Amino acid sequence: MTCGPAYESVDGVRRLTNFATGEIGTILSAAFQEGGYDVVCFRGEGSTFAAPTGVGLQSFSTNDSLARALRSLPRQPDLIFHAAALCDFKIVAIEGSDSKEKISSRSGGITIHLEPAPKILPELREWFPQALIVGWKYELDGQRSDAIASGAQQLRATGSDVCVVNGKAYGEGYGILRRDLSLRHCQDKKSLALALMEILAKNEKSTSAH
């Protein structure tokens, strides 16, 4: 389980990050643990929601640190649920200051150059070929149909098995979108956890049958 925010360091005391709290990943980690699964929760250092108990915990800072942590897992997981709010952009240059420790406001204005950051979700299929891979699509703009379309695009682009769609565009609750584009609506986090455990159980049964 990945959750919470990543960050990009501007200098030794400032960061570019987001408002993710780690709540959904924490709640789902606890639910899967209660369901009998061995859970490792990778939480962004900036997570503010209380950490789950009874599960393995690893913290991460940047996109790269999460990637390294995932690749160092000692065994292949049955499921990867990637809900971490990673940085969409990385800092490639800062003009106007040479300081790495703390940029002084006395130096005047600075210009921060950003470029798109590599995504982790598209790499997960190669890293974990046998795992059920669940991504996350949080959409603010548009209607529910737009959010679902974005989720479908994610499934096609990343090779993941499931996409959980939510946000203002989707509306209340969560949508579980499968590769066949079937959609299951979950009213709350508890029903989402139960639905994901059901999907995992069916996937395990199908895999063992082969």
What does each model-found stretch correspond to?
Residues T2-H210:
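A cross-family phosphate/adenosyl-ligand binding-site feature
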